[in-house]
């Protein structure tokens, strides 16, 4: 009841085409598409910069990170060595 029906949208579209012409609408559409494409590219570049900055900040330390399996194996070795020393 309160919304715009399909017939009203078609009438508005016909009036817009008559006022501006198809050529002007075509150039307007291509300009709009180019601006949206440029905006998406700029946003992608911004996200790329953020990820590069995040990678740089996470790799600030001068030491190599150890694998979790390597950590557990070295901890197991140290506990067995301490048990052997206590038993002696």
UniProtKB/Swiss-Prot annotation:
A GO cellular component entry from the record: TAT protein transport complex
Coiled-coil ranges (or none): none
InterPro entries associated with the record: TatA/B/E, TatA/E
Keywords: Cell inner membrane, Cell membrane, Membrane, Protein transport, Translocation, Transmembrane, Transmembrane helix, Transport
GO BP: any one term: protein transport by the Tat complex
Composition skew (Basic and acidic residues), residue ranges: 42-65, 73-88
Gene Ontology MF terms in the entry: protein transmembrane transporter activity
Membrane-crossing segments per the record: 1-21
Stretches for region Disordered: 41-88
Keyword Zinc-finger assigned: no
The protein's assembly and partners: The Tat system comprises two distinct complexes: a TatABC complex, containing multiple copies of TatA, TatB and TatC subunits, and a separate TatA complex, containing only TatA subunits. Substrates initially bind to the TatABC complex, which probably triggers association of the separate TatA complex to form the active translocon.
Family: Belongs to the TatA/E family.
Functional summary from the UniProt entry: Part of the twin-arginine translocation (Tat) system that transports large folded proteins containing a characteristic twin-arginine motif in their signal peptide across membranes. TatA could form the protein-conducting channel of the Tat system.
Protein's name in the database: Sec-independent protein translocase protein TatA
């Amino acid at each position: 009841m309160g919304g715009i029906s399909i017939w009203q949208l078609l009438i508005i579209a016909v009036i817009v085409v008559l006022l501006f012409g198809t050529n002007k609408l075509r150039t307007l559409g291509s300009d709009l598409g180019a601006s949206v494409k440029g905006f998406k590219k700029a946003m992608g570049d911004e996200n790329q910069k953020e990820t590069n900055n995040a990678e740089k900040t996470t790799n600030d330390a001068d030491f190599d990170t150890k694998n979790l399996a390597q950590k557990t194996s070295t901890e197991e070795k140290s506990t067995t060595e301490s048990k052997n020393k206590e038993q002696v």
